[in-house]
Amino acid sequence: MNWKKEILEKLAFIKSHVKSASLGAKEQEVSYNPCLSEEDIATFEHKHCITLPEDYRSFISEIGNGGFGPGHGLLPLDKAIVDFKLRDKPNISLNEKFPYSDNWNEEWIASFDWEEEYPETEIVDAYISTAHIAGCLQISHFGHGCTFLLVVNGDEKGHVWFDGRADYSGLIPKMTDGHKMSFMEWYISYLDMEIENINKSLTDSIND
């Protein structure tokens, strides 16, 4: 089964069962935005001096430019470059390389006395600066300011990372079977998790 067929079949299953399974998503939310044209994608890549990871590029051109996904859903490409967590909503610099290859967090966080004080504004601003996520798209808002990142520039290109800086947990690559997850691995694993939750909910309702 090719990835496009697999995704659409899994989405159809989720959409057809989401109401009976009493899950949080509504039927109208289990959908995708219109696809981007090849011309639109090429223009974006040229503007930011990058090439998108092939699986993500195929997704937004053949499945949809954002929509159903982890957290609050997949963000469309033009929204994925904006760091919405910050007051001035700066764009993320995609033509710079993502600076990390392994879990990262500031050392001061582990030793900080959170019950007695709060870090100075300058320290927090440096911690949440977009410089830490240069070369990344924010592809999904997980909640409480935490996001999923797709690296599009640097040695980590094509890998999905979790940005937990909003709750001071740093930057962490998403892993599966001992290796870092690609966009497609990450997204299909999300669909599989939703299907597992639906099946469990349906089984529980039968047994009640």
Predicted regions and their residues:
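Segments surrounding the PLD/"HKD" phosphodiesterase catalytic module and close analogs
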Residues: T147-M181
